[in-house]
Amino acid sequence: MNLAYIPSPTFSKFEIGPFTIHMYAICILIGICVAVWILTTRWKRYGGTFDQILDTTLVTVPCALVGARLYHCITTPADYFPPTGNLVNILKVWEGGMAIFGGISVGTLVAFLWCRHKHYPFAIFADAIAPALPVAQAIGRLGNWFNQELYGWPTTLPWGLKLNDADAIGKSEICYSGAQCPDYRTTLFHPTFLYEMIWNLIGAALIIYLGHKLADRLKAGQQFAMYLMWYGLGRTWIENVRINYSTVILGLRTNMWTAIIVFVLGCILFVVLYQYGPDPKAQARGLAAVTADELERQSIEEERLRQKKQAKRTK
């Protein structure tokens, strides 16, 4: 048994009165809050406001979470659909099971439609959120640590993960395939959640650095394309290490196929935007005009309400 290892938490939830608080949910919420802060900071530099981000977040985040959950359930049908699963399990989000690919897909679509509705330039919105997404994902991965899930193959490395719950072993591909499960008391596993955390944080730093360094050369939307390429590439090799149950298609795990597609789409998007993408400065001017119009209408509405209240007092 290795003397050096990463321990697993001894709890995944706690009670406050009649309420049960799950660490998985807390990690996701913290990740969302940090992402909104990063997004707001970058959006304001383009000429936007916090209120615009707040409205967009309130519309987009719930849809993205639903998309993340549904993608996970659809790609691991044995746990959620008859005859082996139970549809009620789809609602048990506190037990884990939020697939980022589903969140990215649905969240991007909803954000695009919302930006069109509000006349916000979507390309610079995508750039603004590009480094925020991997940071949120990195924080969210801590929830997998608390749930003792999404670990990798057995290892003897000094940063191997030590499980403290026999049920955690049952989440591995080894047990699903009928092979004898390793003894969780003497076996360490690759902490793939940690690998993805580090990969995502490096990616966020690179996007911010390259976005600043190449500001005069990048087209609007290319920073988001960088995110797709980076995450797709990283998830491809991480999926090779993970041993949680997954549907296999043509010898590859479902998430590996999705990661490859995301990487390829990111490459195509980067090249297309390089040739035909909009100018970030022009998009920023467009956003500034929309913001000015919104603020003017807001000021007029506030003045109307003020006069209405004043009229009531004089009666």
UniProtKB/Swiss-Prot annotation:
The protein's topology relative to the membrane is: Multi-pass membrane protein
Q: What is its main location?
A: membrane
- Source organism, top-level taxon: Bacteria
- TM annotation in the entry: 19-39, 93-113, 188-208, 256-276
Q: Where does a 1,2-diacyl-sn-glycero-3-phospho-(1'-sn-glycerol) bind?
A: 141
- Keyword check for Transmembrane helix: yes
- Output the Gene Ontology cellular-component terms: plasma membrane
* Signal peptide range in chain numbering: none
Q: What protein name does the entry list?
A: Phosphatidylglycerol--prolipoprotein diacylglyceryl transferase
